[in-house]
Amino acid sequence: KGAAKGLLEVASCKLSKSC
């Protein structure tokens, strides 16, 4: 679960380009 949540956060971060 932790890894999946991390991937989701990275994906949303890249989509919003606010890393």
Curated annotation (Swiss-Prot):
User: What keywords are assigned to this protein?
Assistant: Amphibian defense peptide, Antibiotic, Antimicrobial, Disulfide bond, Secreted
* Cystine crosslinks: 13-19
Secretion signal, residue range per the UniProt entry: none
Expression by tissue: Expressed by the skin glands.
**Record's subcellular location:** Secreted
Name the InterPro entries on file.
Antimicrobial_frog_2
Q: Which GO terms describe its cellular component?
A: extracellular region
UniProt keyword Secreted, yes or no: yes
One record GO biological process: defense response to bacterium
Task: Decide whether keyword Signal is in the record.
Answer: no
Name the family. Belongs to the frog skin active peptide (FSAP) family. Brevinin subfamily.
Its function, per the record, reads:
Stimulates insulin release by BRIN-BD11 cells in vitro. Has antibacterial activity.
UniProt name for this protein: Rugosin A-like peptide
Organism from which the protein derives: Pelophylax saharicus
